[in-house]
Amino acid sequence: MGKTIGLTGSVATGKSTVSSMIQQAGIPLVDADIAARKVVEPGTEGLKEIVAYFGEEILLADGTLNRAKLGKIIFKDKEKREKLNEITHPRVKEYMLEARERFFRAGEELVFFDIPLLFESHLESLVDQIIVVWTTPETELKRLMERNNLTKEEALARINSQIGIDEKAKKADFVINNNESLEKTQKQVYTFIERFVKNK
């Protein structure tokens, strides 16, 4: 059995950049956000359960999930948010574990799980080690304001809805400092990968 590495960070710390670097290095990566979309595609049991609970009006004309509408509903209603998580989370977990199993059967020795809310969702047990992509909170705030065109207050509200990046870094087995150049970030990514995969 190979090793599973959890990749996480906070909003605008650069996790997507590191995720791309890992894939460019030829290492398999299973993305929780993609899994979350797959398990509610038309024809899935996940979507059927969502429609049964939220009603047909949660669908777009083409039968796909109206994510914007659903997002507004669950943002305001804790009970409905918990119900959605109850429907989707076990399916996302199953999707990711099945994908990992396929990679291991194909002879891969290292698989990354890209999970934005790894700590918040208490999914540490799915992985052998955890990488946190870190920047200073000041850099995180600046990047988020620029990237999403947000006010300082809006950006802080998003950042504060998650566990702080410094706290996540303390829980990590390995921290990638993404506060400087992309070259320095890439060097850290490759250094980590080389610890596990000698022939890549």
UniProtKB/Swiss-Prot annotation:
Annotated localization: Cytoplasm
Gene Ontology biological-process annotations: coenzyme A biosynthetic process
Record-listed ATP binding positions: A12, T13, G14, K15, S16, T17
Gene Ontology cellular component annotations, sorted alphabetically: cytoplasm
Enzyme class: transferase
Catalytic reaction(s) noted: 3'-dephospho-CoA + ATP = ADP + CoA + H(+)
GO MF terms, alphabetically ordered: ATP binding; dephospho-CoA kinase activity
Domain of life of the native organism: Bacteria
Main location: cytoplasm
UniProt xrefs under Pfam families: CoaE
Keyword vocabulary terms for this entry: ATP-binding, Coenzyme A biosynthesis, Cytoplasm, Kinase, Nucleotide-binding, Transferase
Biological or metabolic pathway of the protein: Cofactor biosynthesis; coenzyme A biosynthesis; CoA from (R)-pantothenate: step 5/5
The EC number(s) this enzyme carries: 2.7.1.24
Family label: Belongs to the CoaE family.
Function: Catalyzes the phosphorylation of the 3'-hydroxyl group of dephosphocoenzyme A to form coenzyme A.
Protein name (database record): Dephospho-CoA kinase
Organism: Listeria monocytogenes serovar 1/2a (strain ATCC BAA-679 / EGD-e)
